[in-house]
Amino acid sequence: MKGRPNVLAIVLAGGEGKRLFPLTEDRAKPAVPFGGTYRLIDFVLSNLVNSGFLKIAVLTQYKSHSLDRHISLSWNVSGPTGQYIASVPAQQRLGKRWFTGSADAILQSLNLISDEKPDYVIVFGADHVYRMDPSQMLDEHIASGRAVSVAGIRVPREEATAFGCIQSDVDGNITEFLEKPADPPGTPDDPDMTYASMGNYIFTTEALIQALKDDENNENSDHDMGGDIIPYFVSRNDAHVYDFSGNIVPGATERDKGYWRDVGTIDAFYECHMDLISVHPIFNLYNSEWPIHTTSEGNLPPAKFVRGGIAQSSMVSSGSIISAGTVRNSVLSNNVVVEEGATVEGAVLMPGVRIGKGAVVRHAILDKNVVVRDGELIGVDQVRDAQRFKVSAGGVVVVGKNQVV
């Protein structure tokens, strides 16, 4: 857009991610590796950067070392025009306490807003997999004249009970914001679909500051953006829904247009990986017109297949070696080794994993640097797996970081 206003983007990256345990045992949820070479936070940061928003504060808290390191190594966009992507930990500016909720995180970081003096503040989550052009949402927010716009994705009503749900009128004004309702509202044009909140918001700055200060003094508040701040604006008839289905990203196909996944559970995380590996994937990582950025792999050699090693319907990242082993329907991160006679099927292997000779790994997620001994079986005997590892409701076996099994 011409004459773009001053915008500050705040990414909420302090999530603990308990439902992704043990993948979050030693790292914040946005730092969890994803898709072979990425981390979850790379998706929101790529969307913002590709859209031209280059003043970004990433608010961190929970076990943030690997996240902070990733941002400093992969996202150095500083320049003479004041652009930056900065990791901002909890600083206890309002007393000796950590962030008590997502709204409190922004309240404690109001100095960032004071320094930048933005016209609008983008507040996005850090742990979803999707492509989006936020500038289109900003344009619609400005045109709406409302204090806040909430990105909504259309989902079938029967699936919407797990989300914050938006009821709106035909003009996009939000009339009610419901947290995980038993009977989700339909959209104005389709009673069988519901607007689920994506956790992405754009605020007019003055209105956001006032809402945060009012919320601070509310003893009954949980200080949560979705649970408290958005209803605050809805009650004042000052909230607008942005229909994500209208967001057109360059290079998107009809197959992956509107793709958005909340990967907050092991099963959702696993299924999202499986979305990547079909011939015509539901979510296409190879869209060069709207790339997902991350650390360069320039110092790693290409993946190598030797002694008859094969990979079918899989993604195999740089530095990996398949030596007389077989990989099917799987996603392998950097520096994975699959040895002679080993079989990996329907698995997600994170960096540095070693699969020993004759071992079998099926329907599993193996975190960084896991070593599977020769002849070991994972994902074959559910009873034995449950005695040793976490097994999700969908039967996905998860082996935590640095284990030798």
From Swiss-Prot:
It catalyses: alpha-D-glucose 1-phosphate + ATP + H(+) = ADP-alpha-D-glucose + diphosphate. InterPro entries: ADP-Glc_PPase (IPR011831), ADP_Glu_pyroP_CS (IPR005836), GlgC_bac (IPR023049), GlmU/GlgC-like_hexapep (IPR056818), NTP_transferase_dom (IPR005835), Nucleotide-diphossugar_trans (IPR029044), Trimer_LpxA-like_sf (IPR011004). Alpha-D-glucose 1-phosphate binds at residues 164, 179-180, 197. Its EC number is 2.7.7.27. Pfam families: Hexapep_GlmU (PF24894), NTP_transferase (PF00483). One of its GO terms (molecular function) is ATP binding. It comes from the Bacteria. It is an enzyme of class 2 (transferase). GO terms for biological process: glycogen biosynthetic process. Keywords: ATP-binding, Carbohydrate metabolism, Glycogen biosynthesis, Glycogen metabolism, Nucleotide-binding, Nucleotidyltransferase, Transferase. Pathway: Glycan biosynthesis; glycogen biosynthesis. Belongs to the bacterial/plant glucose-1-phosphate adenylyltransferase family. Homotetramer. Involved in the biosynthesis of ADP-glucose, a building block required for the elongation reactions to produce glycogen. Catalyzes the reaction between ATP and alpha-D-glucose 1-phosphate (G1P) to produce pyrophosphate and ADP-Glc. This is Glucose-1-phosphate adenylyltransferase. The lineage of its organism: Bacteria, Bacillati, Actinomycetota, Actinomycetes, Mycobacteriales.
